[in-house]
């Protein structure tokens, strides 16, 4: 009976290892987005919070690799917090996207002219790259949050 319970543990361990890999990828992506967005306060703050959360959740992910069945509440808590971070990072990406569109095209009703016509095209592409990095980190966080498998654990009689 104990060998059957241990077989499920190896599957959970692979899920936890994949989750750790996704956390590291999200840390890299949010760090790049924070570095690229130094002028945009909201985007920097949101990605900084997400990066800090990901760094703080690494020990819990490593613990879940070593002991997959020890505390199932850890996985639930991480899943909920991952979804909160997805919402924050997505909000930052949307805010940066709106600023990008207004700066690029202007707004005729508000009598705003295009800002990008006064600068070279490289700064325009830098902001576009920032938005893509933020969206990429949001997608990685979303995939990480959906990675958790909820399955019924076999009870040992």
Swiss-Prot record:
Residues 35-40, 104-121 are extracellular. InterPro entries: CASP/CASPL (IPR006459), CASP_dom (IPR006702). Keywords: Cell membrane, Membrane, Transmembrane, Transmembrane helix. The keyword Iron does not apply. It is a multi-pass membrane protein. It is found in: Cell membrane. Residues 1-13, 62-82, 143-157 are cytoplasmic. The chain crosses the membrane at residues 14-34, 41-61, 83-103, 122-142. It holds the Pfam family CASP_dom. It comes from the Eukaryota. One of its GO terms (cellular component) is plasma membrane. The keyword Glycoprotein does not apply. Homodimer and heterodimers. Belongs to the Casparian strip membrane proteins (CASP) family. This is CASP-like protein 1. It comes from Picea sitchensis (Sitka spruce).
């Amino acid at each position: 009976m104990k060998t059957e319970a241990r077989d499920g543990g190896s599957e959970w361990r692979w899920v936890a290892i994949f989750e750790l890999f996704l956390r590291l990828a999200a840390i890299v992506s949010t760090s790049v987005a924070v570095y690229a967005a130094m002028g945009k306060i909201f985007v920097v703050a949101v990605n900084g919070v997400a990066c800090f959360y990901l760094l703080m959740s690494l020990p819990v992910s490593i613990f879940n690799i070593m002991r997959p069945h020890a505390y199932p509440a850890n996985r639930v808590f991480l899943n909920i917090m991952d979804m909160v971070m997805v919402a924050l990072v997505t909000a930052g990406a949307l805010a940066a996207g709106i600023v990008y569109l207004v700066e690029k095209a202007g707004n005729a009703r508000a009598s705003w002219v295009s800002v990008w016509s006064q600068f070279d095209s490289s700064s325009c592409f830098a902001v576009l790259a920032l938005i893509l990095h933020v969206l990429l980190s949001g997608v990685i966080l979303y995939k990480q949050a959906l990675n958790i498998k909820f399955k019924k654990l076999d009870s040992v009689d």
